[in-house]
UniProtKB/Swiss-Prot annotation:
Matching NCBIfam families: A_tha_TIGR01569 (TIGR01569)
InterPro entries xref list: CASP/CASPL, CASP_dom
Coiled-coil residue windows: none
A single Gene Ontology CC term: plasma membrane
Stated name of the protein: CASP-like protein 2D1
Basic and acidic residues bias spans: 175-186
Residue intervals annotated with topology Extracellular: 27-48, 103-131
């Protein structure tokens, strides 16, 4: 299967990222719980959760932009393959770092850390922890999509480097024709 054969799965992955990122964003951004005894907790009280919301917004916006950009005809889109590869990689890395930050906060909320006198909080704010867990799971699914997209983008870039696209007249580029005609003698 060539790079052109990956067009439909690539578009499907890009389209999947949008609702996954937006659902994760919504689940976390609407996450707050109040308790008469222990007060209130909101996602914005914890920087790791705020970071997750921000990264979800950025990756959803990029996914929409990349769907629009990849809907152009291939010769125009081919010029931007390197940009798409770098942006897919950057999105995947942002998703990894924000997932890591949110997972650490959830771990502390569930189990605490006696060494630094951080008590567990999920027994008091169970709904908050549940929504944060759902948001993190949706975020991980978006991460899986971007990991696959990074592989597809890399395949496209590096397979096109080995086989240059034809000129406007449908012929291989002049340097490729010259290389094919050269005879090597040992």
């Amino acid at each position: 299967m060539g790079a052109a054969g990956l067009k439909v799965p690539e578009m499907a992955l890009r389209l999947c990222v949008v609702p996954l990122s937006l659902a994760s964003l919504w689940e976390m951004a609407s996450n707050a719980q109040a308790d008469d005894t222990y007060g209130e907790v909101k996602f914005s009280d914890l920087s790791g959760f705020s970071y997750l919301v921000g990264v979800n917004a950025v990756t959803a916006a990029y996914a929409v932009a990349s769907v629009l950009a990849s809907s152009f005809k291939r010769p125009l889109a081919a010029r931007y393959d390197w940009v798409v590869l770098v942006m897919d990689q950057a999105s995947a890395y942002l998703l990894v770092t924000s997932a890591s930050a949110a997972a650490e906060l959830l771990q502390l909320a569930r189990h605490g850390d006696r060494g630094v006198s951080w008590g567990e909080a999920c027994s008091y704010f169970g709904r908050f922890c549940g929504k944060a867990t759902v948001s993190l799971a949706l975020h991980a699914a978006a991460l899986a999509c971007f990991a696959a997209l990074s592989l597809v983008s890399a395949f496209r870039v590096f397979s096109s480097r080995c086989h240059p696209p034809p000129d406007a007249d449908g012929q291989p580029p002049k340097h490729a024709r010259d290389e094919e005609q050269r005879v090597y003698h040992y």
